[in-house]
């Protein structure tokens, strides 16, 4: 995710598995 986007805020609405793929 772009540094301009707070992953903590976006993570609240995005599926956890999405974070797993990116992180």
From Swiss-Prot:
Enzyme class name: hydrolase
Organism of derivation: Philibertia gilliesii
Pfam families: Peptidase_C1
Job of this protein: Thiol protease.
GO MF term set: cysteine-type peptidase activity
Subunit structure, as described in the record: Monomer.
Activity control: Strongly inhibited by the cysteine protease inhibitor E64 (L-trans-epoxysuccinyl-leucylamide-(4-guanido)-butane). Not inhibited by the serine protease inhibitor PMSF, the aspartic protease inhibitor pepstatin A, or by the metal ion chelator 1,10-phenanthroline.
GO biological process terms on file: proteolysis
Record's protein name: Philibertain g 1
Keyword Disulfide bond attributed: yes
pH-activity profile: Optimum pH for casein is 7.6 and philibertain g 1 retains more than 80% of maximum activity between pH 6.7 and pH 8.7, and 50% of maximum activity between pH 6.1 and pH 9.8. Optimum pH for PFLNA is 6.2-7.2 and philibertain g I retains more than 80% of maximum activity between pH 5.8 and pH 7.8, and 50% of maximum activity between pH 5.2 and pH 8.6.
Family: Belongs to the peptidase C1 family.
Listed EC numbers: 3.4.22.-
Keywords, comma-separated and alphabetical: Disulfide bond, Hydrolase, Protease, Signal, Thiol protease
